[in-house]
Amino acid sequence: MTAEHFPVTELAKDLISRPSVTPLDEGCQTLMAERLSAIGFNIEPMIFEDTTNMWARRGNQGPVFCFAGHTDVVPTGDISRWHTPPFEPTIIDGYLYGRGAADMKGSLAAMIVATERFVTKHPDHQGSIAFLITSDEEGPFINGTTRVIDTLEARKEKITWALVGEPSSTLKLGDVVKNGRRGSLTGNLTIKGIQGHVAYPHLADNPIHKAAPFLAELSQMHWDNGNEFFPPTSMQIANIHGGTGASNVIPGALEVMFNFRYSTEVTAEILIERVEALLKAHELDYDISWIFNGLPFLTGDGPLLDATRYAIHQVTGYDTSPQTTGGTSDGRFIAPTGAKVLELGPVNATIHKVNECVKVDDLEQLALCYEVILEQLLC
């Protein structure tokens, strides 16, 4: 059997062919549920507004090993720039092309196939295996994993270890696993002024001029030094808007959106206090609101990281590098429950781009890694 016809490749193609642009699922979870139900999983759909979620579990005892992931994908972008139609999975020169190939339908296929193989070999495995799948990871993440976790917490159902299938690898499969993520905090700031004619500045109050010294100081502030696991906290101004578009009107307000990616050396509360103290020091008239996107988390040495290191070495022959760089993932909603969380998935070079693709051989290797991890933890 060639790699093009491995079970993991066939399942990945079936998932990719479903145009599940967030928050749509387009039957992906039904397909997964059918495969899992056939090997003894209890399937629990959880529908919250426009979002399709699935909690599937095999076993009633702890520890609970959970595969976590998402069936939704980002929009395709300009279809004319794709070599092949984004929802018609195509293999070219050993790569599987299609939206979601790397992020993260390839991982979902590898999870299912690995679990099928594991259960066939070890029908009386220890503990429980679970799947937490959502169609709201690429969107506003309001009705997805966070709502499922709330449901599980309310009935005191705990996850021991969670493996998220996000594309963690950089140059080759398994070279990087994410064993933590920085926290994310967004500020939406409005600096108030008085609109007027540019020829009569004494009758107006320009919020851009007033805010400029504050923004300059904010952008130069030192927040912390990071630590051995996390880089220093960073702040980036993402959007600035002021004015009517006319050259002869002083704007009445300036809107600024900025985002922190912060380490465990600070808290969101400390960052908020420092920003608002700076606003007051510059004597600005302002409104500000804050969006908490996720707390930082870290999974150190222990059974999950040990099993993942071992699996990658056994399958690929090289050692992995645990890192906390990059954006946020749904792991940030699982970690606060006390679960240990890691991310392991394909190479991320083409995610969210046109011509997204994944190496076909990598999908089979990823399934093998997942299977070895299960064996290390539940046998």
From Swiss-Prot:
Annotated residues for binding of Zn(2+) 1: H70, D103, E166
Reaction it catalyzes: N-succinyl-(2S,6S)-2,6-diaminopimelate + H2O = (2S,6S)-2,6-diaminopimelate + succinate
Binding residues annotated for Zn(2+) 2, in chain numbering: D103, E138, H352
Free-text remark on how the cofactor is bound: Binds 2 Zn(2+) or Co(2+) ions per subunit.
Pfam families hit by this protein: M20_dimer, Peptidase_M20
First-level EC class: hydrolase
SUPFAM superfamilies given in the database record: Bacterial exopeptidase dimerisation domain, Zn-dependent exopeptidases
The UniProt record lists the keyword Metal-binding: yes
InterPro entries assigned to the protein according to its UniProt record, in alphabetical order: ArgE/DapE_CS, Bact_exopeptidase_dim_dom, DapE_proteobac, Peptidase_M20, Peptidase_M20_dimer, Peptidase_M20A
Record-listed E.C. numbers: 3.5.1.18
Keyword Cytoplasm: no
Cofactor (UniProt): Zn(2+); Co(2+)
Example of a GO MF term: cobalt ion binding
One Gene Ontology biological process: L-arginine biosynthetic process
Keywords recorded for this protein, A-Z: Amino-acid biosynthesis, Cobalt, Diaminopimelate biosynthesis, Hydrolase, Lysine biosynthesis, Metal-binding, Zinc
Active-site annotation: D72, E137
Pathway as given in its UniProt record: Amino-acid biosynthesis; L-lysine biosynthesis via DAP pathway; LL-2,6-diaminopimelate from (S)-tetrahydrodipicolinate (succinylase route): step 3/3
Subunit structure: Homodimer.
PANTHER family: ACETYLORNITHINE DEACETYLASE (PTHR43808), N-ACETYL-L-CITRULLINE DEACETYLASE (PTHR43808:SF31)
Known function: Catalyzes the hydrolysis of N-succinyl-L,L-diaminopimelic acid (SDAP), forming succinate and LL-2,6-diaminopimelate (DAP), an intermediate involved in the bacterial biosynthesis of lysine and meso-diaminopimelic acid, an essential component of bacterial cell walls.
Stated name of the protein: Succinyl-diaminopimelate desuccinylase
Species name: Shewanella sp. (strain W3-18-1)
